[in-house]
Amino acid sequence: MVKTEKFIQKSVEEIQKEAGNEKVVMALSGGVDSSVCASLAARAIGDRLIPIYIDTGLMRKGETERIKAVFGNIRLQVVDAGDEFVAALAGITDPEKKRKAIGERFIRVFEREAKKSGATCLLQGTIYPDRIESEGGIKSHHNVGGMPEHTAFKKVIEPIRDLYKDEVREVAGALGLPPEIQHRMPFPGPGLAVRILGEVTKEKVAVIREANWIAESEIVEKYRPWQCFAALIGLGTGVKGDNRIHGWIVAVRAVNSRDGMTADPLEIPFADLVRIGSRITAEIPSVARVVYDITPKPPATIEYE
């Protein structure tokens, strides 16, 4: 458990020291990690903070609209970079290379936006599990191992780098952030790209975006998982009507966890799983098969890539 008031005071002082008199751009995704960072930085440097939301084209259904609505009261800059990210991922199938391509593109977009405002520092919501998995070679997170070696920023500020996810939520509560942010399900920085095995294309993104929305709509309110989602894991043979199809295989995953370091699969009644599978195959014609992932972490990671 983190001593929230002491942590908040220390973090504000750290941001002030690191930023000096410089302007700071920050990556605001709308999740609890980046929202806590935004709140801390706003206290520390006021209007020298420039929050930026990058629409990568890899976001969940309605995500960008939700961000605009929730953070409409601050000077949030929204950057549409979807075509850039899809182009950067073209032809890449290796998960590590995908994460590094996304990390590189994030930094280049932030550098471009920072240049417009004269900002020289970048602030981001890296947390301790990101560092453990990246440094331990499990998988590179876009904001740690996936970042390019050289950037135009004088400093990268990471005020919550030593916190676990449950500790970040405690700090969010102490900062007075609304429950919808404090308890929001994690969503990976690389977005739906890490829920697509193999090359990322606009067609695949459209399929998994809809499947993910169906999975969340069926599971979140009823079961309150730590995280749930759908992933596109390959192609398989199916039958629709009297016709054979070669369609997508979608895996649904729902887990409970405390800090994201370990996780257990959610025990969803079979009837509900059947309904989820039926909805996905009926509402997305190109999907031929739906499976439910019962693997804990470890041995699996929560996300597929």
From Swiss-Prot:
Read off the InterPro entries from this record. Answer: GMP_synth_C, GMP_synthase_B, GMPS_ATP_PPase_dom, NAD/GMP_synthase, Rossmann-like_a/b/a_fold
Bridged cysteine pairs (disulfide) = none
Record the organism: Methanoregula boonei (strain DSM 21154 / JCM 14090 / 6A8)
GMPS ATP-PPase domain boundaries: 2-184
Q: Which GO terms describe its cellular component?
A: cytosol
Gene Ontology molecular function? ATP binding; GMP synthase activity
CDD domains the UniProt entry points to: GMP_synthase_C (cd01997)
**Swiss-Prot/TrEMBL catalytic activity:** XMP + L-glutamine + ATP + H2O = GMP + L-glutamate + AMP + diphosphate + 2 H(+)
Q: Which PANTHER family match?
A: GMP SYNTHASE [GLUTAMINE-HYDROLYZING], GMP SYNTHASE-RELATED
List the keywords (alphabetical): ATP-binding, GMP biosynthesis, Ligase, Nucleotide-binding, Purine biosynthesis
PROSITE patterns membership? GMPS_ATP_PPASE
SUPFAM superfamilies, per this entry?
Adenine nucleotide alpha hydrolases-like (SSF52402), GMP synthetase C-terminal dimerisation domain (SSF54810)
The pathway this protein participates in, as annotated, is:
Purine metabolism; GMP biosynthesis; GMP from XMP (L-Gln route): step 1/1
**Name by which UniProt lists this protein:** GMP synthase [glutamine-hydrolyzing] subunit B
Function recorded in the entry: Catalyzes the synthesis of GMP from XMP.
Does Glycoprotein appear among the keywords? no
Q: How does it assemble?
A: Heterodimer composed of a glutamine amidotransferase subunit (A) and a GMP-binding subunit (B).
Class in the EC hierarchy, top level: ligase
Q: What is its EC number?
A: 6.3.5.2
